[in-house]
Amino acid sequence: TWEECCKNPGCRNNHVDRCRGQV
């Protein structure tokens, strides 16, 4: 899930815009 991805520094760094869009 995006939530799990955003919790992962490496994954989040690759999807910063997506993670910032997820509240």
Curated annotation (Swiss-Prot):
Task: State the residue spans of region: Lacks the Ser-Xaa-Pro motif that is crucial for potent interaction with nAChR.
Answer: 7-9
**Where expressed (tissue)?**
Expressed by venom duct.
* One Gene Ontology cellular component: extracellular region
User: What are the UniProt keywords, alphabetically?
Assistant: Acetylcholine receptor inhibiting toxin, Disulfide bond, Ion channel impairing toxin, Neurotoxin, Postsynaptic neurotoxin, Secreted, Toxin
Q: Name one GO molecular function term.
A: acetylcholine receptor inhibitor activity
Q: Where in the cell is it found?
A: Secreted
Signal sequence interval, chain numbering:
none
Disulfide bonds, paired cysteine numbers: C5-C11, C6-C19
UniProt remark on domains: The cysteine framework is I (CC-C-C). Alpha4/7 pattern.
Q: What does this protein do?
A: Alpha-conotoxins act on postsynaptic membranes, they bind to the nicotinic acetylcholine receptors (nAChR) and thus inhibit them. Is a specific blocker of the alpha-3-beta-4/CHRNA3-CHRNB4 image nAChR and may also block alpha-3-beta-4-alpha-5 (CHRNA3-CHRNB4-CHRNA5) channels. Has possibly a distinct nAChR binding mode from other alpha-conotoxins, due to a different three residue motif (lacks the Ser-Xaa-Pro motif). In vivo, causes hyperactivity and behavioral disorders in mice following intracranial injection.
What family is reported?
Belongs to the conotoxin A superfamily.
Q: What is this protein called?
A: Alpha-conotoxin-like RgIB
Lineage of the organism: Eukaryota, Metazoa, Spiralia, Lophotrochozoa, Mollusca
